[in-house]
Amino acid sequence: MNASIHHVNVTVPKSLEDAAKHFYGVVMGLTEVPKPPESRGRGGAWYQLGDLQLHLSLEDGLGADCISKRHVCYTVSSLAEAEQKFREAGVEIIPDDMPTAGWSRFYVRDPGGNRLEIAQG
């Protein structure tokens, strides 16, 4: 079997759909791609992320107890520019608590509490 990743799915509460779409579409600058007709009624959005896609899904019953270290790592060309953009959008920067030689990074959380690692690519 030859496996590869097509998409990553993150979930947010239905009440945070607009905030999450703003976060991924405006703050992160991802391009929204059309969802197939059978998926459009479910809400959320799909975004192109290089050769992969990020699928934003809506799910009730998510709360603060769902916060964890699970994350997706996004590489950026300039860590300083990314940090500035997040700060300007009011997103809290979570410093790297376990620095790794040769790997500069920080973390943020989307409106639904999903953790994102932002690393210099």
Region annotations inferred by a language model:
Residues 1-21, 70-72:
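N-terminal beta-strand motif that seeds the catalytic metal site of vicinal oxygen chelate
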Residues 29-37, 92-97:
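Short secondary-structure junctions
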Residues 31-66, 115-120:
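Conserved short beta-strand elements that form part of the metal-binding/catalytic scaffold
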Residues 43, 70, 102-104:
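Residue-level marker for the onset of beta-strands and adjacent loop->beta junctions
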Residues 65-88:
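Mid-chain, well-packed structural core segment of small domains
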Residues 1-3, 88-121:
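Vicinal oxygen chelate
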Residues 20-25, 86, 113:
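Conserved active-site tyrosine of GNAT-family acetyltransferases
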